[in-house]
Design a protein with these regions (language model features):
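GST superfamily/GST-like fold recognition
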Residues: 2-6, 44-69, 77-85
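Residue-level recognition of alpha-helical structural elements
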Residues: 16-19, 47, 69-72
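Terminal-tail/helix-coil boundary detector
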Residues: 89, 93-123
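Juxtamembrane/interface motifs at transmembrane-helix termini
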Residues: 5-9, 73, 99, 111-114
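Surface-exposed helix-capping loop/turn segments at secondary-structure junctions
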Residues: 36-47, 88-92
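Conserved C-terminal alpha-helical bundle
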Residues: 1-42, 64-66, 101-105, 120-124
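Charged catalytic carboxylate motif
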Residues: 26-30, 55, 75
Length: 124
């Protein structure tokens, strides 16, 4: 859902209010699920750091771009802070820093991708 949130809120060439609202709200609901899960345990799958944490963390790091407020999710906020300070996380994000300033998709890439999709749909 966070991916759809990013697509409709950031990348889509046409801003569709219904889609943006739907995915912002769905992301909010899922943040609530994560927050409730983390209320009684340190990590998503229990008391040990696991692939569940590794796989989920990158989807919640851009919480501001997803139009979420961490103040609404205190357990999720704690978990993000905990993972953010892990040496492996610090190292991984430092290695990715040179790429972070670049757009994930260029305008030409967007146009190609969306144009290709349109061509595919017209061919159906």
């Amino acid at each position: 859902m966070a991916g759809q949130n990013h697509h409709f809120g950031i990348y889509a060439p046409e801003k569709i209010p219904y889609a943006i609202t739907r995915y912002v709200n769905e992301t909010n609901r899922l943040y609530g699920v994560l927050d409730r899960r983390l209320a009684g345990q340190e990590f998503l799958a229990g008391d040990a750091y696991s692939i569940a944490d590794i796989a989920t963390y990158p989807w919640v790091v851009p919480w501001e771009r997803q139009q979420q407020k961490l103040a609404d999710f205190p357990h999720l906020k704690r978990w993000i802070g905990s993972l953010q300070s892990r040496p492996a996380t610090v190292s991984a994000y430092a290695r990715g820093e040179p790429f972070a300033a670049q757009p994930a998709v260029t305008e030409a890439g967007k146009n190609f991708s969306l144009g290709k999709l349109q061509q595919d749909l017209e061919g159906v």
